[in-house]
Amino acid sequence: LRLIIESQVDAIIFDEKRLNLAKDVITSKDSNVKYFICMDYNEDSNGILSFSKLLKDGKKLIESNSSKYNSISIDKDKLSVLIYTSGTTNNPKAVMLSQYNICSNVSAMTTLIKYEKDDSILVFLPLHHTLACLASFLFCYYIGFRLCFADSIKDIGKNMVEYKISGLVCVPAVLEIMYRQIIRGVKKSGKYTAFKFLCAFSNFLMFFHIDIRRKLFKQVLDNFGGKMRTIIYGSAATDKKVIHLFNTIGIDMLQGYGL
């Protein structure tokens, strides 16, 4: 409630689970909110608007040749987004961003990431974090990737295989888990010595720009769905040996950061 009042927003969009919070905002004398939009309502009710009804009404306006939406003037440098920090050390602070901040980062990602039309990105980080929102949610919409939401953190591995994920945005803790799974699996198979040799051989070939990493480590990559090519990580320090291993087996690692 404090953040809604502090940010002086005109509208809030919420699901039915947050209905009590919305009612608190409605009764608050300090709130500037004019529009309350519920994702789960099919019809407007008690001053709360239905998201699906708004979409239908907007579609009707466009079909009737209304130009209200397309004629809206956008100032790309104007404050458009407030994203609050986690508040780990103190009260959450609002990070002020413009549309240009957001769009320029999403556009720049296309120059760094190799992508194919049938790629899928796995999402499990909170989308109110700038890195997760930019590198997964908005980037997927910009490029046309399929966006897959993980069932839970413990199901990430299963979801990678199920959805044949080609890209992942995560924190170092997830990388550590994946790293341990790889090492544990190789040792269990009794092929750890051969694996270390292939790692050295792969890096030797890469020195001469010969890239057959995905052929050498196909069995390992199959455990992550077989299509994983890129991982974007951030928010904390990552052990170099973890990054080095993923690069060695054919997964390109990119360090991201929130705006």
Where are these regions (language model features)?
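Structural core segment of the AMP-binding/adenylate-forming
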Residues: 1-56
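Conserved AMP-binding A3 loop
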Residues: 80-106
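Structural detector for helix-capping/boundary residues
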Residues: 51-52, 77, 100, 125
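Conserved pre-ATP/AMP-binding loop-to-beta segment of ANL
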Residues: 38, 59-84, 91, 114-120
